[in-house]
Amino acid sequence: MKKRILSVLLLTTALAAQNEITVYNWGQYISDGTDDSMDVIKEFEAETGIKVNYLTFDSNESMYTKLKTGGTSYDVIIPSDYMVAKLISEDMLEPIDFSNVPNFEYIDETFRNQSYDPENKYSVPYTWGTVGLIYNTKYISEEDAQSWSCLWNSKYAGKLLMFDNPRDAFAIAESMLGYSYNTEDAQELKNAADLLATQKPVLQAYVMDQIFDKLERGEAWAAPYYAGDYLTMVEENPDLAFSFPEEGFNFFSDAMCIPKGCQNKEGAEAFINFLCRPDVSAANLDYIGYSTPETAAKEYMDEEVTSSPVAYPDPSVLERSEAFEELGIEATQTMNDLWLSVKTEGANTTLYLTLTLAAIAAVVAFFLISAAVTRRRKAKRCRKWREAE
């Protein structure tokens, strides 16, 4: 009887898994029905009957850690180019059955067979974009905003934000030093870390998704971030502007993948296929502001978006960009260690200074109180002497 119950439970669980998928995506990276936009997930659920459990991450590194440590089974993930390459090299992705993704035909040739997945076995492009400097024109001049050095400018101390992930943060320092974003040279990585350390005194915070509120409300005046997100932020704060810094900037592609251990591969492929449909891609990317890898989708999109020099920069501008590639294990570890050092040493210094100042204040207070008590005692003795006389 127990075996029969267990068999029924296992069958029920298996059938349930076939009717749902878990999607792991960047925060604020899908059209969700807000402002009369398409609710992509609801539309997919209505068309297929497959329920979507939707979870978000704020960096490639945090997503990678989640996959490595396990605990949750994901069916679709959307990492960036260099992270796709890393996941492939570590045998963490399932090959995609493209017979279940016929809408792949709409992906432009330019975005197929990229270096991170040269045979296009494991990924389908979702979006592409760039990183630039978002700044508040009320406080920061256009001239200052043409260089990444703006983020080190003491004039704006306390109002500057920085990426809270090593790859993006190091890329900015590497731009300023004239290094490739894909350098594995230990000394160059150390030099980049040293430059990042000099930035810390002028920063308000290291952030990722928190950047939206901080820039939209004017709590911070400048930050490096993704062009697509800028197009969302500027709707909330028209004082914001975007620049492609003269030293260079990152060009990236994000792609849909299926991780090993997924529970519903066919459901995952159905979801990927749905997102590749031109009208869905158009509605989705029209809302999130990122650039589409499908020319066919542009026919459905707002011309204001497709003609935007931020979303679709001129080729002459893109010549200054560089894409991330997968770093070797040693270089990755070196970068992570240096990044930890940049963040924690500054924090320890701040803590040390705070404790030191508190100790000094306590000592000063002690002497002031002691002096006051002594004066009162002397005054009291003087009164007694006068009374005795």
Where are these regions (language model features)?
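Conserved C-terminal helix/tail region of periplasmic/extracytoplasmic solute-binding proteins
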Residues: 316-389
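Ligand-binding "clamshell"
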Residues: 88-95, 112, 117-121, 232-244, ...
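Short loop->beta-strand "edge-of-pocket" segments that line small-molecule binding or catalytic clefts
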Residues: 150-164, 177
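Ligand-binding pocket segment of bilobal, Venus flytrap-like solute-binding proteins
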Residues: 161-165, 169, 173, 181-245
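Early extracytoplasmic/lumenal segment of secretory-pathway proteins
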Residues: 18-86, 213
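A structural signal for short loop-to-beta-strand junctions that line the ligand-binding cleft
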Residues: 72-76, 94-133, 159-161
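Short beta-strand->loop
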Residues: 94-105, 123, 238-250, 259-262
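Mature extracytoplasmic/periplasmic domains
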Residues: 259-320
